[in-house]
Amino acid sequence: MTAFDRGIVNHASASYNRADMRSAFRLRKKKPRPRVPEGVRIYAIGDIHGRADLLERMLNRIDADLASNPVRIGIQVFLGDYIDRGPASREVLDRLVANNRSFRSVFLKGNHERYLTDFLTNPPILGVWQHYGGLETLMSYGITPSINANAATQAQLAAALDRALPESHRQFIGNLESSFTCGDFFFAHAGVRPGIPLTKQREEDLLWIREDFLLCEEDFSKIVVHGHTPVPQPDIRPNRINIDTGAFATGQLTCLRLEDDKLDFM
């Protein structure tokens, strides 16, 4: 039994009655197993949130995996939320900007990167951002933040971040993609809006959606690989896979490995 099948079994045990379980397995039997193109291996990495230590460890594991199991085309897909919450947001971006990888890397945008760029042009958003780890990001750039800052202080902090933000970080964040597709898989930070074709999804939904997506059991036409909503362990459903395991708090950064029709975790 593969990881994909185990995920369906585990989800069925937790959430389905017996009739629903039989229905879920009939659905899987009718459809071919999701796969990536021949000769391609994907490493999808969940929300990093300022944990440069975990990122470095994961990149080393990926390098070791490629060295011991070479593949024609390797692709790293980062699902966004590189910053906030953890202590080393600047160091995470430094590492990703350097990107001295010998294979393709795809960097997706998360809602926390949106917070940062919005703060630069709309300082009062700090009142919200500070509750989601924004102060930790400011501190990683050498800025001493003020809790419950007034409008003048918010503007000063935004100006300080604007000065401290390296041009390489600015370009990196500005070039982040909203989604990525490969084979039978669609990658986005938060998920997708049910009922809307994948090619017509709004960036707001790709970055922010939660319940409407998480509670949906319909077929999205591809398996959606996402983060955004922390779970204790990777959550495999028939229509989506969540790999945000709350790295900033748990110390567990998850990488999903896809090759042919096989799925496992690192």
What are the roles of these predicted feature ranges?
Residues 39, 71-73, 102-104, 183, ...:
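A general structural motif
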Residues 103-138:
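Active-site HxH/HxHxD metal-binding segment of metal-dependent hydrolases
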Residues 92-102, 168-175:
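Catalytic-core regions built around general acid/base machinery
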Residues 45-46, 77-80, 107-110, 223-229, ...:
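Active-site neighborhood of phospho(di)ester-bond hydrolases with catalytic His/Asp-centered motifs
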Residues 30-38, 67-68, 96-99, 178-181, ...:
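A short acidic-Thr-Gly-centered motif at the start of a beta-strand
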